[in-house]
């Protein structure tokens, strides 16, 4: 990770600030308490959130909101993280949070943003937003106070904190979790044992149920045998019953056949009677048809005579009608023509009156237009164009504006002269001024003022006159356009009036022609009015005779048709020639023959009815025997069903018991398996975790000691003095083979030990977490250093090979080691950052 920029707003002592970071060594220098460490805390807050600290420890006391924006790169990819703090009724909480990557802004919650940052940095840590980043705190940035507290803390506290830094707590957590799991498994195993305590009792209960079931199955087997014998006897009796039943069916069939034959005989008798009645009806209808045929013949002859008489009268009237038809046609044509001429005449008279009214209206309208044209032609041309007048107005307005400016200057001079006259001293040179000179100046200025004001008034009057002229020009242009439109309208109206007069003349000529035709039609109608009346009378009489002729013809046709029907029917009804009559006689003979045959069959069936009582008695006895055997069989079946129910109940009980026994066996088996797990956890896994932690801690101690000694030798050039750490990571200083208390060391030596301890811790944590960090942050690492020790820091930086190192110090001598220098100062409680190198 490489930091590129940091922006703060209302964070601790900062109202606002921005820092640009580059590769190399960046130094933040300033007095103690100026706000240098706040920058480092802001970086940590931007990356990981508040952690276990309170929001009001970061938010400026006088502000209700603040924010930090951090831009950094990882593997060449740039990211920007933004976190906001807001003060509310419940305290200071995080507000808007987002991350920008690949140009896309994504708003997240505190937990989601921390997870995103940890994934980008490759830190494998818990996602709890209220926990600090262990890797960052020990591999990148360790505050000065925290490092001193680690070194000076009691050994148990120091070991506990270093175990967290080295992530060795996972072994003790694993052992503690194993203990919890072991206790839970033991409780589960004991619970399973309790649930399977009565397994042997259940087995004995199962054996008893199996014995009872065996006895019931033996009883069922005997009942099956008894039922089988009874059903065989029932089958034998039913076979005998079937023989008797067939005989009974034969008797019942004979009874039904006798009844059927008797019904058929009765039907045949009824049929013969109907046939004889039908023949008598045919003979009667034959006689009636002969009488009706004679009557129809008489009526037909009378109708034919009447029809012949009507035909002669119709022929005479048709001759008369032909002679009157031509006169009647001419009369109708003359009447139609007369009505059409009258209608057209009325329409033409009305149209003529309308045209006369329209012509009168057009003449009045054209007179009014001519009068208006004469009035508008009297309007005189002003003699100027609008552009000319507008140019004149603009010129006058410019002159007025210039004069007003001059008038303003004159007013100022008059006020100055009056002021000098009152004071008697020139405000520019502070010399006395002659009053006469000032009075002359005042008179001259006032005279010029009056002249200018008079000229302005004249110019304004002239502008007003030109505006009036503009109105007259506009009025003249409007009148010219309106005059053009009126002349065009007048021309159209005159042409329209001329067309209407021509139409009126045409209508008057047509009226004269219609009146002549009307007189001719009236004369012809008068001559032919009697011919039409005579023709209508003949037409009416002819129509009446034809209707009578049609009626007689219909009656004659009906009489002829009825006679044809009667002749056909007489032929059909003649007993000598009628097929139906002869067929009826034949069917009567056949019915008598069939009746004799059916009576013979009745006598045959009556022989079969003699043994009916004997068959019915045998059937009754067999039915009683079968019923008794079936009752016995049903009793046996009921007993067998009861036994089967008991067997099923026993089988259900056995199944439930076997299932319960199987479950209890599984519970006991599972309890023993869980007991084995408890033994493995307590006797093998938990001790192994302790051994692994001890072994890993020893390896870390060895590596830490080597790095601690290496960095101390670089910082302290004293061959007689050496350092090491014991098994509790306590730093031990030896001088010429004797241990030396840390309290007796110089300030520079104690700082060297703390810095060497910090660098060793950073490098070990980086290796253990497999995090390759390109950045190192050191907070006040040189307190008490000599100049020689300060210069040795450059060797340490070169050996660390970090792309970016951030130093916070109040030592100005570190400027020689820094590539980029920022000065932090505090004024009136507000910190300010300024780049100085």
From Swiss-Prot:
Domain Zinc-hook: residue ranges: 379-478
Coiled coil: 197-419, 462-551, 634-673
Keywords: ATP-binding, Coiled coil, DNA damage, DNA repair, Hydrolase, Metal-binding, Nucleotide-binding, Zinc
Record bears the keyword Flavoprotein: no
Binding locations of ATP: 12, 144
Pfam families for this protein: AAA_23
Family annotation (PROSITE patterns): ZN_HOOK
GO biological process: double-strand break repair
Signal peptide: none
Keyword Zinc among UniProt keywords: yes
One Gene Ontology term of the molecular function aspect: ATP binding
Classification via InterPro entries: P-loop_NTPase, Rad50/SbcC_AAA, Rad50_ATPase_archaeal, Zn_hook_RAD50
Binding site for Zn(2+): 426, 429
Cofactor: binding details: Binds 1 zinc ion per homodimer.
Swiss-Prot/TrEMBL cofactor(s): Zn(2+)
Notes on the domains: The two conserved Cys that bind zinc constitute the zinc-hook, which separates the large intramolecular coiled coil regions. The 2 Cys residues coordinate one molecule of zinc with the help of the 2 Cys residues of the zinc-hook of another Rad50 molecule, thereby forming a V-shaped homodimer.
Protein function: Part of the Rad50/Mre11 complex, which is involved in the early steps of DNA double-strand break (DSB) repair. The complex may facilitate opening of the processed DNA ends to aid in the recruitment of HerA and NurA. Rad50 controls the balance between DNA end bridging and DNA resection via ATP-dependent structural rearrangements of the Rad50/Mre11 complex.
HAMAP family attached to this UniProt entry: RAD50
The protein's assembly and partners: Homodimer. Forms a heterotetramer composed of two Mre11 subunits and two Rad50 subunits.
Family, per entry: Belongs to the SMC family. RAD50 subfamily.
Protein known as: DNA double-strand break repair Rad50 ATPase
């Amino acid at each position: 990770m490489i930091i590129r920029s940091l922006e703060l707003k209302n964070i601790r002592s900062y109202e606002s600030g921005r820092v640009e970071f580059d590769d190399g060594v960046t130094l933040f220098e300033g007095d103690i308490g100026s706000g240098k460490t706040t920058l480092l805390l802001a970086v940590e807050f931007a990356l990981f959130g508040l952690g276990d600290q309170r929001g009001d420890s970061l938010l400026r006391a006088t502000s209700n909101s603040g924010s930090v924006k951090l831009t950094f790169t990882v593997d060449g990819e740039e990211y920007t993280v933004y976190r906001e703090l807001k003060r509310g009724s419940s305290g200071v909480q995080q507000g808007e949070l987002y991350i920008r990557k690949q140009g896309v802004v994504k708003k997240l919650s505190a937990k989601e943003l921390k997870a995103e940052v940890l994934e980008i940095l490759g830190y494998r840590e818990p996602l709890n937003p209220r926990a600090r980043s262990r890797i960052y705190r020990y591999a990148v940035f360790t505050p000065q106070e925290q490092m001193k507290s680690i070194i000076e803390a009691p050994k148990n506290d120091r070991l506990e904190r270093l175990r967290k830094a080295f992530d060795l707590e996972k072994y003790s957590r694993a052992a503690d979790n194993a203990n919890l799991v072991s206790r839970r498994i033991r409780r589960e195993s004991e619970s399973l044992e309790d649930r399977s305590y009565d397994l042997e009792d259940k087995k004995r209960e199962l054996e008893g149920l199996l014995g009872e079931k065996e006895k019931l199955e033996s009883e069922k087997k005997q009942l099956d045998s008894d039922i089988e014998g009874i059903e065989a006897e029932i089958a034998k009796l039913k076979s005998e019953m079937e023989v008797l039943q067939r005989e009974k069916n034969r008797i019942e069939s004979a009874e039904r056949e006798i009844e059927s034959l008797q019904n058929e005989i009765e039907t045949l008798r009824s049929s013969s009677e109907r046939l004889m009645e039908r023949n008598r009806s045919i003979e009667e209808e034959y006689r009636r048809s002969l009488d009706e045929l004679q009557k129809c013949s008489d009526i037909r002859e009378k109708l034919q005579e009447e029809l012949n008489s009507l035909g002669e009268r119709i022929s005479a009237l048709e001759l008369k009608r032909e002679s009157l038809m031509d006169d009647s046609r001419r009369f109708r044509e003359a009447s139609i023509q007369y009505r059409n001429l009258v209608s057209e005449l009325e329409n033409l008279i009305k149209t003529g009156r309308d045209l006369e009214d329209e012509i009168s209206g057009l003449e009045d309208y054209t007179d009014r237009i001519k009068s208006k044209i004469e009035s508008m032609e009297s309007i005189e041309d002003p003699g100027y164009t609008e552009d000319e007048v507008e140019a004149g107005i603009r010129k006058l307005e410019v002159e007025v504006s210039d004069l007003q400016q001059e008038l303003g200057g004159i007013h100022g001079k008059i006020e100055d002269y009056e002021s000098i006259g009152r004071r008697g001293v020139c405000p520019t040179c502070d010399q006395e001024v002659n009053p006469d000179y000032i009075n002359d100046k005042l008179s001259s200025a006032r005279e010029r003022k009056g002249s200018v004001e008079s000229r302005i008034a004249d110019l304004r009057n002239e502008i007003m006159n030109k505006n009036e002229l503009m109105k007259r020009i506009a009025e003249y242009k409007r009148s010219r356009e309106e005059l053009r439109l009126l002349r065009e309208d007048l021309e159209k109206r005159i042409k329209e009036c001329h067309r209407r007069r021509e139409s009126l003349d045409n209508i008057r000529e047509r009226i004269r022609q219609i009146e002549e035709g009307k007189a001719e039609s009236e004369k012809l109608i008068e001559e032919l009015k009697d011919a039409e009346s005579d023709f209508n009378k003949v037409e009416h009489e002819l129509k009446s005779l034809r209707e009578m002729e049609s009626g007689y013809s219909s009656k004659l046709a009906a009489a002829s048709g009825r006679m044809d029907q009667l002749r056909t029917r007489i032929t059909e009804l003649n007993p000598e020639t009628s097929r139906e009559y002869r067929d009826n006689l034949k069917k009567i003979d056949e019915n008598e023959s069939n009746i004799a045959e059916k009576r013979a069959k009745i006598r045959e069936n009556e022989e079969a009815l003699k043994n009916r009582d004997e068959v019915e008695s045998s059937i009754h006895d067999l039915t009683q025997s079968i019923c008794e055997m079936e009752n016995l069989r049903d009793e046996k079946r009921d007993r067998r069903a009861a036994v089967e129910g008991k067997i099923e109940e026993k089988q259900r009980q056995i199944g439930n018991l076997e299932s319960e026994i199987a479950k209890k066996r599984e519970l006991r088996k599972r309890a023993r398996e869980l007991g084995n797990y408890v033994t493995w956890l307590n006797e093998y896994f938990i001790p192994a975790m302790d051994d692994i932690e001890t072994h890993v801690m020893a390896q870390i101690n060895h590596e830490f000691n080597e790095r601690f000694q290496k960095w101390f030798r670089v910082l302290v050039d004293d061959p007689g003095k050496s350092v090491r750490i014991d098994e509790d990571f306590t730093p031990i200083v030896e001088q010429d083979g004797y241990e030396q208390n840390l309290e007796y060391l110089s300030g520079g030596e104690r700082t060297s030990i703390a810095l060497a301890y910090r660098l060793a811790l950073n490098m070990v944590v980086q290796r253990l977490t497999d995090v390759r960090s390109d950045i190192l942050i050191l907070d006040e690492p040189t307190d008490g250093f000599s100049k020689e020790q300060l210069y040795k820091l450059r060797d340490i930086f070169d050996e660390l090979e970090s792309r970016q190192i951030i130093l916070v110090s109040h030592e100005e001598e570190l400027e020689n080691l820094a590539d980029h220098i920022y000065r932090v100062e505090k004024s009136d409680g507000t910190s300010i950052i300024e780049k100085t190198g």
